[in-house]
Structure formats: structure tokens, C-alpha cells
Amino acid sequence: MKQIAILGSTGSIGTQTLDVVRQHPEAFSVYALSAHRSIDLLIKQALEFNPAVVCIADETYYRPLCEALSDLPIRVLAGKKALAEMVTMPAIDVVVAAMVGYAGLRPTIEAIKAKKTIALANKETLVVAGEIIDRLAKRYKVDILPVDSEHSAIFQSLVGEDMISVEKLLLTASGGPFRNFTLEQMQYVTAAEALRHPNWEMGAKITIDSASMMNKGFEVIEARWLFDIPVDKIQVLVHPQSVVHSAVQFVDGSVKAQLGTPDMRMPIQYALTYPERWMSDVARLDLFATQSLTFEEPDLKRFPNLALAYEAMNKGGNMPCVLNAANEVVNLAFREGRCGFMQMSDVIAKTMEKTMFITEPTYEDYVQTDKEARKIALELLKR
């Protein structure tokens, strides 16, 4: 039986991971759960799954969490340092990195050092410090299995293949709720509109990133590190139906793709059961009901965030870290009504210009870069 730690268990990926566990109680046991501050749901999960340990990142919730679980033999931890230590516990086999944003970097690094298998949903970890993560995974011989639907599709399409035969990766994007909006219309869209994704059910932050196509930019960077492939061999295709989750084109001209209904439990389960496939109750894809599959080139004028992601990756160094930090600032500001939709790209671009560039950053450099870029982005928002 695999012992699982879920970082970010109260978020969209975390709750769907627990759905997978419910389907296969004979195979998976929840050893550890963590949340940022969603204490009520964390308590509910702890009561259902009876983990050995729970951790709340926001230390102000430590006492009420302890009180709520006082009758159970569950160890309660709090704080970012405790979270990074929790993932190294010997009993844990798999760490599901489902935390949102930069906060997922340190615990993922510690889990790799402890030689845990990583089921990676936190794409920001590879965006911020892909080179370090790649180096550590190779050093400690740790498997990093993708949970993102697109990267899982590529991963599945590569089974039995040699990377030398890969011509390019085809990364699909739904285009989000504003795919058919004009540039003028996009100036006035609201957070409420952006949060209505046409195909996928996700958390608030990633849904906004999807609407701005920054999420797809992050996925390009993530794919570069996961599959050790140059960025110029990663092509983004807008595919509104979200049926083809992504594909691989080979040197002989053939293309392998993974298709399915838009349900994150599929890639989550595959990451947990790889290399095997197990039964699942997700809805089956009805190809007779699928009227058409269409593909378009992304419009970089209306979605400049995708171009900024390519620019950051091509420049390298700490620039993807700058991209991520600035995006986290403007994403929250947009959700809170302090930033316009198209203004987000402007702030990110200017932050990339103003933040000190470091060619070969260390972990400490990434920490400082994150702080500097956030400060610059916040100052730009005030103007």
C-alpha cells in the first residue's frame, strides 16, 4: 500500500486526489495532509482519512486545529518549516505537490532530497527553479510524474519511445473564456468572467492564469524541464474542445496524442498508479457525440503572457522566477479588483525589465529574486 502525502489537500487538485484515494482504499493510504489556511476542510479531511500527520502553513490556525483533532492520534504541525520537514518522514512513498504558487518550491526540494516519488501539480516549482529541480531529481534518482493533464498526456504519449525520435511537443490550450473576445473587449473583462472556465474545474488562481494564457506559458516551461527538450520544440495549439489533452510529433511525421474527457482525476490517478492503469469512474469519452476537434494558433497580441513566458525561458537564469513572482502579484490584484486584465501583462513585462538578472542563480538567489520581483510589481500597481 502506498503512503501518500498531499500538499495542498484542500485545493482543487488535493480534493480530487482524495477522490482517487476513495476509489482505491486498498491501494492508497493518506499519511499526511497540508493546507494553507482552509482549516475547516482540512479538519473534515483528517476526520475522514485519519492521517498520521496534518500541517497548516498559516501558524495562526495551529491551536484551533489541535483542539479540533485532540481526540485523534494525529500529529499536528504548523508553519512553512514544519511543512518542509513533514515531506521527509520515512513512511511517505509519494508526495502529491498540489500547493499553489511559489510556496510549493521548498517542500518539493526537500521531498526530492528525501527520495520521495513526486506527483507534481505545482507547475510553479519548475517555472521558478526548473534547473535546480532537474539536477536534484537526477542526483537523487527521483521520479517526477506529471499531474497536469497536458504533461500527463505527453508523458503517456512518450511511453515506449526514445526522446531522440521526438520532433516536437504539441501542448494544447482551451483558449479560455476570452478566446473570441476582441482586444478592446478584453480591456474590460472582470474577475468573475475570467473565473468561468469553459471546460475545466480548477482553483481561482490557475483559472485566472488560464484566462490570461499565463498558465500555458508556465506549462511550456514545465514541459521543457520535465521532458528535457528545447523550448523551440514546444508548440502551443488552441484546442477549444479540450478533448486532445496534448500530443507528441515524431521525426517520421507520426503524431501520438492522449484523448479523454476533461477530468483531472485521470492524470492524478495515472501519476499515482504509473506504470499501471487502474479502473476509474470518470466519464468515458464519447467520440460519436464529439462533433469536431479544432486547432488554432494562439494570438500573442491578445494573450501576451504566453510570449512573455517564452521570453523568460529563452533568457534563462532567474527570469522565469521573475515572471512567476510578478504574475502571482497581478493575479491576486486582478481577483481583488486592483488591476485590469490586460494590465497584468504590462506589469509583468516591466517587472522583468526592472528586476536584477542573474545568469546562474542559486536557491538563495531565487528566494531574493522572488522578493525583489514581488516588490517591484506591487510598486508598479500603485502607479
What are these regions (language model features)?
Residues 1-383:
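Catalytic, metal-anchored helix/loop core of enzyme active sites in primary metabolism
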